[in-house]
Amino acid sequence: MSQTLKKRGGNSSGRKSPTTSNIEFDDKKTEFDLNAIVPPKEPEYKYLAALTLVTLLAIYTRFTKLGTPNKVVFDEVHFGKFASYYLERTYFFDLHPPFAKLLIAFVGWLIGYDGKFKFEAIGDSYIENNVPYIAYRSLSAIQGAAIVPIMFLTMKTLGFSVAACLFSSIIVCFDNAQVTDSRLILLDATLILSVALTIFSYSKFSTFRKQSFSSKWWTWLLATGVSLSCVISTKYVGVFTYLTIGIAVIHELWILLDYRKGLTLQEFAKHFFARLWALIIVPFCIYLYWFYLHFAILTRSGPGDAFMSSEFQETLLESPLAAHSKPVQYFDQITIKHKDTGAFLHSHQHEYPLRYEDGRISSNGQQVTCVVQENAANDPNNQWEIVPTSEGANKGTKVYTNDIVRFRHVGTGGYLLTHDVASPLKPTNEEFTVVYDDVAQQRYNETLFRLRLHVPGSNPKKEKNKKEIKTLATDLRILHVDTVVAMWTHNDELLPEWAFNQQEVSGNKKIPDKDNIWNFDLITNLQSTDPRNQYVPKKVKTLPFLRKWWELQMLMFHHNNQLSSEHPFATQPGEWPLALSGVSFYNDNTEKKQIFFIGNIIGFWLEVCFLSIYIGILLADQITRRRNVHVLSDRARSRLYNTLGFLFVGWAAHYLPFFLMNRQKFLHHYLPAHLVAALFSGGLVEFICSNNSARPNGKPVGVNKYKIIAVVAACSTAIIWFFFYFRPLTYGDVYLTPEEVKARQWLDIKLHYGK
């Protein structure tokens, strides 16, 4: 021990402790300390041979049986359908940005597919419907196969040995979850490839840290930015990749800011703004471009219309809204439709119970609810007459936004009112009811409502524009003048049987809420002789691109945040690193075949072991150094904290934020973190198999080739064995007996046909 460890209190060699204060900086060099890049350790031909091997293996695992099954599998129902909508140019709405979906549609366009098949249900036949599904799946397979050699090149760029490069590549090449997701018409192959390209590009950029602003320096910095834009333009979990690179960039800039680097503030500013331009501005412009292309292609009315504002819908060809909207006039009898739930404002001659089950007291007034029903316009209980409140407003006078009106219920003759009485289901909201005759006159101010125009992105309290109101085409907030609440309904909880399980209507104090939007759907008393019945072709309107983008962006965020309900396939982040359970993607009841989405459990568990070992090494190093005992050499510590630290942060940034999210979470969300953990695992194996001693101990400096080959061979053999053992569940091409199915129900895996 005395020969290998530097003891407390003594430093007979006169060598200084390798503390931060003793680090020497080269003047005017942009040395980036986060990735302690070193040259490759072995001859180039060995890297080339190993790279060729893993590339061929990746192609084999991704392209084998690509046409099996020849039916719709899992989320192909969504992303195949979106490709068809692009090909037909019909507008649709989705939570994810357009980039990866545009790539899928581009494949269909290249081969001349018309998009007639709509991928309605899992199990629908591709063969019977003449769908070019193998071409679609080939896009994912190409991307999935490309991930593996890019990982290898990343490890090589970071200075790791051939064995370490091979091990990282094998973990992903033979991971069942990665293979499954890169063989189907899904977005994940694009996402993970973009993550891999980002880390590779940034690693390459770091190798040119001493050649600031050279062409290669700019090339790889911009390549990092473009890759980041591809990540964030595929799925919004790409923000975690931004977090990874952001932490590295902040660390790098912090080093450059040190006066010992010798940079002037002007030179530091050049570094700062170069990164701002390449990593934020350029990616954001590319991100916007995909939305521009999205809008340019989707010019026809489609299933996504209902999500968008009326103004947006009027920009689409063949929009029923543009064709059938009519100006609304006073004394028109209309139906009022809630935009979010599609329910109609309704009332009937039944009262709220005087006392609710929780003991609260109601007004015992006439119920006001919302209903979803066909031919809603034919029911007088869904019809409301718009009564003016200003002098001079007669029959035929147009209704404008910001007008103050009253609503008379056609079915019962009373007036809509809300007041300071708690609603049945939401005690913080106000109850809506209907009052009659003298009471309506006495409480006149409580029957007044302002029709406030909804403009996406604007503050509804400040929206003062007066605009002609049209059926279908004008989105409104209906604001109570007296108590300043917005009329609101919801369908997450329905009223009890005393209200026929209809939707509650209440006054919402949070006026800006996006759920407060209504429109006048249909004029029910429009006479055949009314000039408004004469069809006049309407010109398709235009909206500025940024206005359309902002509206869609806010809707995507809003609906993404609404994904908080339970899902049968949802899992918790704590289960992911150990692949405790998976998801049934497809099952064929006739041939008893199935596809089950699960990671390579051996590979996943090995990654967790290596991550845990790393944390243990860090703790041991910090504790021993507090006692002035230096076990690791300076070079080993640089490797431990810089290169491996960067990859560890990358894993944590792609994984830990999911614990803070309230939305639905699935195992496939872990795949980017799994990719980074695979890179990390190869690096840590090399670290463990190297001589990292701070003092000469007679052992060769560097990697122990025999040790690393033995470790990599043993771990890789186990990973590859598991991959082929679970292969029938990955490809869905082999029948398993019930006994064979049961034998594969590891951990919490639940498979079909085990009986």
UniProtKB/Swiss-Prot annotation:
Residues 1-23 are annotated as: Disordered. PROSITE patterns: MIR. One of its GO terms (molecular function) is dolichyl-phosphate-mannose-protein mannosyltransferase activity. Gene3D superfamilies: 2.80.10.50. Its EC number is 2.4.1.109. Its main location: endoplasmic reticulum. Forms a functional homodimer. This is Dolichyl-phosphate-mannose--protein mannosyltransferase 4. Keywords: Endoplasmic reticulum, Glycoprotein, Glycosyltransferase, Membrane, Repeat, Transferase, Transmembrane, Transmembrane helix. Protein mannosyltransferase (PMT) involved in hyphal growth and drug sensitivity. Transfers mannose from Dol-P-mannose to Ser or Thr residues on proteins. PMT1, PMT2 and PMT4 account for most of the protein-O-glycosylation activity, while PMT5 and PMT6 may specifically modulate a much narrower spectrum of target proteins. Accounts for the O-glycosylation of AXL2, responsible for bud site selection, as well as of the SEC20 t-SNARE component. O-glycosylation of SEC20 is essential for its stability. Required for biofilm formation. Disruption phenotype: Impairs biofilm formation and shows reduced virulence in a mouse model of hematogenously disseminated candidiasis (HDC) and using reconstituted human epithelium (RHE). It comes from the Eukaryota. Residues 325-389, 396-454, 466-523 form the MIR domain. Induction: Transcribed in the yeast form, but expression is increased two to threefold during hyphal induction. Also up-regulated more than twofold when PMT1 expression is impaired. MSB2 functions not only to secure basal levels of the PMT4 transcripts but is needed also for up-regulation of both transcripts upon PMT1 inhibition. Repressed by BCR1. Pathway: Protein modification; protein glycosylation. It is found in: Endoplasmic reticulum membrane. GO terms for biological process: cellular response to neutral pH; filamentous growth; filamentous growth of a population of unicellular organisms; filamentous growth of a population of unicellular organisms in response to neutral pH; fungal-type cell wall organization; negative regulation of proteolysis; protein O-linked mannosylation; regulation of endoplasmic reticulum unfolded protein response. The gene is PMT4. SUPFAM superfamilies: MIR domain. It catalyses: a di-trans,poly-cis-dolichyl beta-D-mannosyl phosphate + L-seryl-[protein] = 3-O-(alpha-D-mannosyl)-L-seryl-[protein] + a di-trans,poly-cis-dolichyl phosphate + H(+); a di-trans,poly-cis-dolichyl beta-D-mannosyl phosphate + L-threonyl-[protein] = 3-O-(alpha-D-mannosyl)-L-threonyl-[protein] + a di-trans,poly-cis-dolichyl phosphate + H(+). It holds the Pfam family MIR. Belongs to the glycosyltransferase 39 family. The chain crosses the membrane at residues 92-112, 147-167, 185-205, 212-232, 237-257, 278-298, 595-615, 640-660, 670-690, 706-726. It is a multi-pass membrane protein. GO terms for cellular component: dolichyl-phosphate-mannose-protein mannosyltransferase Pmt4p homodimer complex; endoplasmic reticulum; plasma membrane. It comes from Candida albicans (strain SC5314 / ATCC MYA-2876) (Yeast). Glycans are attached at residues 11, 445, 691.
